[in-house]
Structure formats: structure tokens, C-alpha cells
């Protein structure tokens, strides 16, 4: 068979286009704001300061990721201009930052903006502007509703489903459960809470005490005292790392030893477990979907070896024990793949189209057996987790991979 050279093929296609009067789609370059022949602008907000500042490492690691991509030639020949702003975990500040990113910096999309309350504040704005709001750093179930909000997509397993899994596990494994709940008083906390109640079903009356805190509170000591005094023998901890560490440390000070279920967003050894005191967190249960860098079983895994080498080269000084650095690397890899799939069609519409077109994609640092799948009607990229129990200085996975369609 005669081998067709690229030059011959393109010339032939051009001739065909002249005959038919149609343009050659694959030869066209299409750009919206934030994209050009040389650059792709991506916007980001992160709490580099404030009560959730432990998540600041996510933004720093994402910056390092794009630096490494640019050093390797960029994405399809275009350098990434990553603009990351500090919103302090303050929704009103997030609005200010995102307006700047969209209206002044004119980014192609925002990526991994962090926090349920912060993303809630910009949700309607981004969809009204029809600017992609991709792979947000929050598991609220509202990020997976393409009919109502076609320009917003989540990333991690949604909080509602995660909470259902905790509830079902405790009902099956804790005898005579009396449950105390600590919850951040916003949409993030409420999403977990609603899922937890759904999972408990007819056993919802096992919740004997439910207390809340505000992200601006200095401590949650008084709330933990109330939970202990309720007689609860199970503690469902719906809090960000600062308060997760405080609450588990306070429980130990009070000699309160419930079975603790800790939301995934506060499972980092570096930012939550060590600050709480390792002796105070033995046996804590969480759900995971990413490889934990402190788990020795992954030491010989190719993904882990690649990540460690990358961290040492591009993110030197950052903790190899902080799961947030794994999260940032994994979600950046998904954004990277999305942009690669866009080719030269870097429009808002095509970015969303490609983000919604993954089928069982194997993402680096995700647990074996868990993949990324999306479609125009499914905006939940990852919908599976595995339970894990803290032992010694690390998490130990147990049981099977559990998947559930979000409700």
C-alpha cells in the first residue's frame, strides 16, 4: 500500500475542501478569551491565608505542576499562564478574585478553585459568563449537575456519597451506636450531613448530638465537650484540617474515645493527623481514592516513584507526607489531559466538551481500580472510594472499592 505523506494528505484535503466549498475543520484554530497560539490562561483561587490555609499547598503544587509542563514545552506547544489568587477561604473575596480573573485577566477557564462556600459564591456567575469552572476542589454534590450548571464540574467523590458509606459501615460494625456529629456550618458540612442521614435511614435517631462551628471560630473545644457529654460512642467529624486536628486532640484530652469517622478532606497525615497527635488518632476511619504517600505499600509503585521524583525536582521543600500534594498532582494531570484533548480548539465550549468525555481514564496516583469517567450527563469524574484506618503513622486500606451513583 502506498504510504501517504503528511504533505500529500493535507494538499489532498485542501483540494477536497475547495471542491466542496467546505473548510477543513481539523486545520482550524479556534480561540476564546485566554487562549492563543502561544498561551493558555488558567485562573485559580486558594486559601493561602485564613482558617483553611493548610490547603495552600494545593495551589503551590499546582503552580509547580504547570511549571514542569511549561519546561517540557507546554500543552500542544502553548505555555500555561497559571494565575492563582488568595481568597483566604472568604466567599466575598473569592467573588472579587474570580471577577478579576474572568473580566480583567480573561482566563480561558478556572481550575480547582477551592472550598464549597467559595465555589458556591461564584457558581451562578461563572455559568452566566459561560466560562468553564473545572474540577473544583470540593466534593459538594451540586458540582455534578450539567443540566442546571453546564459550565461547572467537580473532581473528587462527592461528600453525600462518602457520608452514606460511613453511615452504612458504622451501622454494620458499631454495636449500640450513639453518634455525635461535628459539622462546619455551610453547604460543605450540610452535604455530608444529608448524606449521613440518608445512609442511616431508619436508624437516624442514633444521632444523639449534632453541633456546628463557623470557619472563623478560633477553636471547637466547646463543641467537642458537648459531644462527649452526650454519651456518644461514635464521632462523625465533618471539618477542615485545622478543626479536625483540634477536635481529635480535644477528644483525647477529655479521655473521650469514640469510634471516629473523619471526612476525606481532612485525612492528610501532615496537615491533620500529626497536628492532632498520632497517639490520639489511632483507629480513625476515613475514605480514600488517592494513594497515601505515607503508606509503604506504594513505595514500589510506578506512580508513586514518579510522583516522589517529580516532587523532589519541581516542588522541593514541600511535604512528601501531605496528601494535598498528591491531590494537586492528580487533578492537575486531569486538567492537563483535558487541554491536550482540546488540540487547537481552545474555546469555552470545547474545553467543557473534552472534560465531559473521559471513559475509565487511569489518572496518576489514584487507587488501583478507580478511574475517571465523565459524559455530557455525568459531571462526577470520580465516584469510588476505599475505606482506610489509621494505624501507627499511616493509613491502612481495608475492604473493597465502593462505588455509588451520587444522589
At which residue positions do the language-model features occur?
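N-terminal export signals
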Residues: 8-27
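Immediate post-signal peptide segment of exported/extracytoplasmic ligand-binding proteins
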Residues: 27-42, 75-79, 171-176
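Extracellular/periplasmic Venus flytrap/periplasmic-binding protein
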Residues: 93-96, 103, 141-144, 150-255, ...
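Extracellular/periplasmic periplasmic-binding protein-like sensory domains
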Residues: 251-329, 401-405
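Segments of small-molecule ligand-sensing domains
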Residues: 313, 317-325, 336-395
Amino acid at each position: 500500500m502506498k504510504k501517504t505523506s503528511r504533505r500529500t494528505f493535507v494538499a489532498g484535503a485542501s483540494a477536497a475542501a475547495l471542491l466542496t466549498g467546505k473548510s477543513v475543520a481539523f486545520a482550524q484554530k479556534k480561540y476564546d478569551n485566554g487562549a492563543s497560539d502561544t498561551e493558555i490562561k488558567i485562573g485559580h483561587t486558594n486559601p493561602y491565608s485564613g482558617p483553611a490555609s493548610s490547603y495552600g499547598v494545593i495551589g503551590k503544587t499546582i503552580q509547580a505542576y504547570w511549571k514542569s509542563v511549561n519546561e517540557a514545552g507546554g500543552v500542544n506547544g502553548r505555555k500555561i499562564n497559571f494565575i492563582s489568587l488568595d481568597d483566604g477561604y472568604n466567599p466575598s473575596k473569592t467573588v472579587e478574585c474570580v471577577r478579576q480573573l474572568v473580566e480583567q485577566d480573561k482566563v480561558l477557564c478556572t481550575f480547582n478553585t477551592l472550598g464549597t462556600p467559595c465555589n458556591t459564591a461564584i457558581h451562578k456567575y461563572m455559568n452566566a459568563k459561560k466560562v468553564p469552572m473545572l474540577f473544583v476542589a470540593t466534593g459538594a454534590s451540586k458540582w455534578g449537575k450539567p443540566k442546571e450548571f453546564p459550565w461547572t464540574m467537580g473532581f473528587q467523590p462527592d461528600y453525600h456519597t462518602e457520608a452514606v458509606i460511613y453511615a452504612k459501615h458504622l451501622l454494620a460494625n458499631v454495636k449500640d451506636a450513639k453518634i455525635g456529629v461535628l459539622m462546619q456550618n455551610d453547604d460543605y458540612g450540610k452535604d455530608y450531613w444529608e448524606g449521613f442521614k440518608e445512609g442511616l435511614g431508619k436508624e437516624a435517631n442514633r444521632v444523639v448530638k449534632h453541633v456546628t462551628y463557623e470557619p472563623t471560630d478560633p477553636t471547637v473545644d466547646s463543641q467537642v465537650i458537648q459531644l462527649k457529654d452526650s454519651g456518644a460512642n461514635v464521632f462523625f467529624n465533618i471539618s477542615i484540617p485545622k478543626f479536625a486536628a483540634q477536635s481529635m486532640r480535644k477528644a483525647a484530652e477529655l479521655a473521650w474515645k469514640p469510634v471516629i469517622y473523619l471526612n476525606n478532606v481532612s485525612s492528610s497525615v501532615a496537615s491533620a493527623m500529626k497536628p492532632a497527635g498520632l497517639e490520639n488518632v489511632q483507629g480513625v476511619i476515613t475514605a480514600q481514592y488517592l494513594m497515601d504517600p505515607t503508606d509503604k505499600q506504594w513505595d514500589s509503585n510506578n506512580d508513586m516513584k514518579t510522583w516522589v521524583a517529580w516532587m523532589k525536582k519541581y516542588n522541593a521543600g514541600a511535604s512528601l507526607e501531605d496528601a494535598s500534594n498528591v491531590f494537586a498532582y492528580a487533578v492537575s494531570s486531569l486538567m492537563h489531559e483535558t487541554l491536550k484533548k482540546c488540540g487547537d480548539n481552545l474555546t469555552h465550549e470545547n474545553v467543557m466538551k473534552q472534560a465531559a468525555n473521559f471513559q475509565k481514564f487511569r489518572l496518576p496516583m489514584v487507587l488501583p481500580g478507580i478511574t475517571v469517567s465523565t459524559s455530557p450527563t455525568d459531571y462526577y469524574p470520580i465516584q469510588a472510594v476505599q475505606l482506610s484506618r489509621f494505624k501507627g503513622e499511616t493509613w491502612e486500606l481495608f475492604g473493597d472499592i465502593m462505588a455509588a451513583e451520587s444522589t
